[in-house]
Amino acid sequence: MFIYDTKLKQKVPFEPLVHNKANIYVCGPTVYDDAHLGHARSAIAFDLLRRTLELSGYEVVLVRNFTDIDDKIINKAFKENKSIQELSSIYIESYTRDLNALNVKQPSLEPKASEYLDAMVRMIETLLEKNFAYRVSNGDIYLDTSKDKDYGSLSMHNSSVEFSRIGLVQEKRLEQDFVLWKSYKGDNDVGFDSPLGKGRPGWHIECSSMVFETLALANAPYQIDIHAGGTDLLFPHHENEACQTRCAFGVEIAKYWMHNGFVNINNEKMSKSLGNSFFIKDALKNYDGEILRNYLLGVHYRSVLNFNEEDLLMSKKRLDKIYRLKQRVLGTLGGINPNFKKEILECMQDDLNVSKALSVLESMLSSTNEKLDQNPKNKALKGEILANLKFIEELLGIGFKDPSAYFQLGVSESEKQEIENKIEERKRAKEQKDFLKADSIREELLQQKIALMDTPQGTIWEKLF
């Protein structure tokens, strides 16, 4: 297995800290709003990593957190007259619902920052004791980045003392010094009683503490195997996580760093701050979650994905091919083609080379369809094909539906009944040699984007996009 390590800026062999085990920490969302397609892409990217590792024989523990203490949450909760717990729980439920729709596997653990306050306080106390942190006059506590000789080594941001000094009001020693603890400021603020005084943790200390509490190995040069997240988190968040872990514990937080690329809308980076977010829940109103997943995984995880509906519909053709083939082989048993399994898994073991893997998949779909055309009753062949498709389901997380359900997505039960009635009416017309009426019914349904296919087993139908 090879992965691209952001810190080394090259592909490297994955050599876990413990043989055949992989510990992964993925930065999850700050839950003050609904999740957008950038969140979806990150979740899918590292879901693919997890699936690939598991199918390669690794025992994987994947932790993805919820940041439920943050300025944005506090500000929105105040505006909506809610507690931060009420507000964050709404968006945690929304995020979970969205990712379930995208067939992202549940993490091994989903810690909330609010559940690890004691651990954060202990870590800050350690940093103060070791003289890596300092308190300013308003009670806030900062990490002194000048004390960490490796600061900037992950993101390559300059960490020299030549960084501009900032106002005495904040009393930060260097611009890149970051807050560990925010003291309680009174009305409209949120604070927790602690040995540090009443206040709340900074963003960066939250993740480092949760990594330490949920995954960190004792007596190892690294706490975990892989730390992952979006490219936008590389600096300052991941840089600061790495810094405070080195300072507090004398070890690196992660052996490998992996980052997924941005999602662009109209060639601009999508973000809430730019006001061009495309929420997952809105996309799901137009497209099934599997169709969205199939599209988002189709571009290599490190590349920028420029979202547009034309490409999404083009990518859906791949799913259509999978389900048409699946429809032909349902109800058969057999073993997977070992060459197909080896070839497609090796593609994914090469830093999740999904483009190459999808090319192998397309080749399998074409060749096996041809073989079925030549020998449609070959049960062994059908069983092998179904086993191949099952492996794709496990590896890529697509192709898991019943074909009939897939091709009838977006059609209500009452509409299905109307279509079945029309098919029955058309059948009677054909029996009575009224082919004009039969053709008229087919055309009427086609106008409603319902396509009919006559098969030896009867007429089947599907919804067109």
From Swiss-Prot:
Which parts of the sequence form the motif 'KMSKS' region? 269-273
Which residues bind ATP per the record?
272
Cofactors required: Zn(2+)
Does the entry feature the keyword Zinc-finger, yes or no? no
For this record, the Gene Ontology CC terms, alphabetical, are: cytosol
Motif extent ('HIGH' region): 29-39
- Binding locations of Zn(2+): 27, 207, 237, 241
Q: Which reaction does it catalyse?
A: tRNA(Cys) + L-cysteine + ATP = L-cysteinyl-tRNA(Cys) + AMP + diphosphate
Q: Name any one GO molecular function.
A: zinc ion binding
Compartments (UniProt record): Cytoplasm
Per the record, the GO terms for biological process are: cysteinyl-tRNA aminoacylation
Output the Gene3D superfamilies linked to this UniProt entry.
Cysteine-tRNA ligase, C-terminal anti-codon recognition domain, HUPs
Q: What are the UniProt keywords, alphabetically?
A: Aminoacyl-tRNA synthetase, ATP-binding, Cytoplasm, Ligase, Metal-binding, Nucleotide-binding, Protein biosynthesis, Zinc
Please share the entry's free-text remark on the cofactor.
Binds 1 zinc ion per subunit.
Q: What EC number(s) does the entry state?
A: 6.1.1.16
Q: Which CDD domains match?
A: CysRS_core (cd00672)
Q: What family is it from? A: Belongs to the class-I aminoacyl-tRNA synthetase family.
List, alphabetically, the PANTHER family matched: CYSTEINE--TRNA LIGASE, CYTOPLASMIC, CYSTEINYL-TRNA SYNTHETASE
Its assembly, as annotated, is: Monomer.
Listed name of the protein:
Cysteine--tRNA ligase
Q: In which organism is this protein found?
A: Helicobacter pylori (strain J99 / ATCC 700824)
**Which gene is the coding source of this polypeptide chain?**
cysS
